[in-house]
């Protein structure tokens, strides 16, 4: 029962992390730039995401536009788009494996094989965690570097958006969930080892010999 509870907890954390990947990928808040003009009415905030950028006016009005070309994205966001999509696919594969290898499912009968499949699912979730950690941390590094770079104009400096924090949280959940699933070791075989039995040879009475 403890092993089943561990699997359920690991799968739940991994599913939450996978949903976090989708949310981080979809939200246009990877980079946030605030422009404050001389008049507070002209204040606006610019959001940059993987698929679109949005401008939010001080009145609350928001306008979003899809990128015309992938080449218009910075290099880190281009890599982030590819890695995030791959991470979503890998996470979906991990969930499929976790369903097949779950103790509470009847997809397979052999408990040893199911445990090995569950360990594989945990490893897949850990790979998905690394795939999202790389682009999120890379983008955060570039944002911080440009923010403290005196050569970058103040109007072009950016701050880290909510998508980065969601991505870090999703990576942590996937890593923790995958680690819990990897703790599901294959059960020991209940089959007793074969032992040869030897019996002493019976002596033949001498009367049987001619």
UniProtKB/Swiss-Prot annotation:
Topology in the lipid bilayer: Multi-pass membrane protein
Cystine pairings recorded for this chain: 54-64
Subcellular location: Cell junction, Tight junction; Cell membrane
Presence of the UniProt keyword Cell membrane in the record: yes
GO molecular function: chloride channel activity; identical protein binding; structural molecule activity
Residue numbers spanned by region Interactions with TJP1, TJP2 and TJP3: 209-210
Sites of Phosphotyrosine modification: 209
Post-translational modification: Phosphorylated. Phosphorylation by EPHA2 is stimulated by EFNA1 and alters interaction with TJP1.
InterPro entries in the record: Claudin, Claudin4, Claudin_CS, PMP22/EMP/MP20/Claudin
Positions in the Extracellular compartment: 29-81, 138-160
Stretches in topological domain Cytoplasmic: 1-7, 103-116, 182-210
Residue stretches spanning the membrane: 8-28, 82-102, 117-137, 161-181
GO biological process: one example: response to progesterone
Tissue: Expressed primarily in lung and kidney. Present in both cortical and medullar collecting ducts (at protein level).
Top-level taxon in the UniProt lineage: Eukaryota
Pfam families named in the record: PMP22_Claudin
Key words, A-Z: Cell junction, Cell membrane, Chloride, Chloride channel, Disulfide bond, Ion channel, Ion transport, Membrane, Phosphoprotein, Tight junction, Transmembrane, Transmembrane helix, Transport
Coiled coil stretches, renumbered: none
Start and end residues of each stretch annotated as Interaction with EPHA2: 1-103
Quaternary context: Can form heteropolymeric strands with other claudins. Interacts with CLDN8. Interacts with CLDN1. Directly interacts with TJP1/ZO-1, TJP2/ZO-2 and TJP3/ZO-3. Interacts with EPHA2; phosphorylates CLDN4 and may regulate tight junctions.
Reported function: Can associate with other claudins to regulate tight junction structural and functional strand dynamics. May coassemble with CLDN8 into tight junction strands containing anion-selective channels that convey paracellular chloride permeability in renal collecting ducts. May integrate into CLDN3 strands to modulate localized tight junction barrier properties. May disrupt strand assembly of channel-forming CLDN2 and CLDN15 and inhibit cation conductance. Cannot form tight junction strands on its own.
Protein family per UniProt: Belongs to the claudin family.
Listed name of the protein: Claudin-4
Organism phylogeny: Eukaryota, Metazoa, Chordata, Craniata, Vertebrata
Gene assigned in the entry: Cldn4
């Amino acid at each position: 029962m403890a092993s089943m509870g561990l699997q359920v907890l690991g799968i739940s954390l991994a599913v939450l992390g996978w949903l976090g990947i989708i949310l981080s990928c979809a939200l246009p808040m990877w980079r946030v730039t605030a422009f404050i003009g001389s008049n507070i009415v002209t204040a606006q905030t610019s959001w940059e995401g993987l698929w679109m950028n949005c401008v939010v006016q001080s009145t609350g009005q928001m306008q979003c536009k899809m990128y015309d070309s992938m080449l218009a994205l910075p290099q880190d966001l281009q890599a982030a788009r590819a890695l995030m999509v791959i991470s979503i696919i890998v996470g979906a594969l991990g969930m499929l494996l976790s369903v097949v290898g779950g103790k509470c499912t009847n997809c397979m009968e052999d408990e040893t094989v199911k445990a090995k499949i569950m360990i594989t699912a945990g490893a897949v979730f850990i790979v998905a965690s690394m795939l999202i950690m790389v682009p999120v941390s890379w983008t955060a590094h570039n944002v911080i570097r440009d923010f403290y770079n005196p050569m970058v104009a103040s109007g072009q400096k950016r701050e880290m958006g909510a998508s980065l924090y969601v991505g870090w949280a999703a990576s942590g959940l996937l890593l923790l969930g995958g680690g819990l699933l990897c703790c599901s070791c294959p059960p020991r075989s209940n089959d007793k080892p074969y032992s040869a039995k030897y019996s002493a040879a019976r002596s033949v009475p001498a009367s049987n010999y001619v």
